[in-house]
């Protein structure tokens, strides 16, 4: 199943390091495109604690009063408050109320309450969220630890080598893509044989090369092995610790953690998947998942409705080859029922940028004439005004074509893939031009 999007910082790092020598190169980003469950930082910290990995003392608060109470419980005069938003760049982000920074150092319970009240219930805008931002519903308050050394360590699933890898760098505590761009030799990849796992020798070698002091190497080795254990036992696709620190009292601590889990493992990881925060996800993508559709928004203006991930990718490719931009990835799967088609059209047309829809269906499991009935009824009931290009190939395709032609609906039935894609791009441009100059446009079918 084609899935988009992993941690963007990692993706940038993959791309940047593809130019580095093989020994220090991260896996290629083209091999890494995955869409997986992400969980909040405070939940990641809880999971690390369960496996005996050192993390700063802290807890989650959903009100200013709770934040104040947690800060009192932690004690001391050095703490950090972090907005719980599933996006990178929180520290440099800005809230919709003008507050700068989603990660701030605080020195008292009073400050904890003050900043919590300014963060909770407001949207944080970062370089990853886009202008719309993401709602902060909770804050994580933890003790501030001072590090003697900071490192970067991640356990990832690498499709190129068809197995897990450990990516490490002595330059932790900073933007990993910046390190990858400026100094790719500082990033190292260790390939793991799943039949052997992370041995003592391998983990100790990684810890030593990172630069942990002699008294911390064994604890760092144990931490690396525990991270790999979490990776395997919880069906993770990504565990990123940045920074993994050696504190001033020579303790190994995971100061910040990002987890990604394989969406296909939800049936055997119920405890993990109940941690999902759908308020942090695109509502249309959540709705699609509930309907059994694989839907991911993109930035273009040609809607795509396809059955099968491979055909969906080929459809997006040929749209781009003809000068267009797909507005979405949408795979209705083998069960392209009339109900699924209607749901798919509602999702596609909810995007105001969409100026044409390309329906590309191969009728193997489902008959093309059944698809045609669903398509015609959907276009009628939704009273769609934008052009629809339908390419229905396979079982009963002639009957499907006849149904569309006899329907009187403005659906362009085209058999050839190139011609259908070309027509989609051309009609999309016409509609976009009409919108730009604020005039109406109608289409007459040449059939």
Curated annotation (Swiss-Prot):
Keyword annotations of the record = ATP-binding, Ligase, Magnesium, Metal-binding, Mitochondrion, Nucleotide-binding, Transit peptide, Tricarboxylic acid cycle
* Enzyme class of the recorded protein, top EC level: ligase
Q: How does it assemble?
A: Heterodimer of an alpha and a beta subunit.
Tell me, in one coarse class, where this protein mainly resides: mitochondrion
Per UniProt, the cofactor note for this protein states: Binds 1 Mg(2+) ion per subunit.
Q: Does the keyword Ribosomal protein apply?
A: no
**InterPro entries hit by this protein:** ATP-grasp_succ-CoA_synth-type, ATP_grasp_subdomain_1, Succ-CoA_synthase_bsu_CS, SUCC_ACL_C, Succ_CoA_ligase-like_bsu, Succinyl-CoA_synth-like
What is the recorded name of this protein? Succinate--CoA ligase [ADP-forming] subunit beta, mitochondrial
Does Amino-acid biosynthesis count among this protein's keywords?
no
ATP-grasp domain mapped to chain residues:
45-287
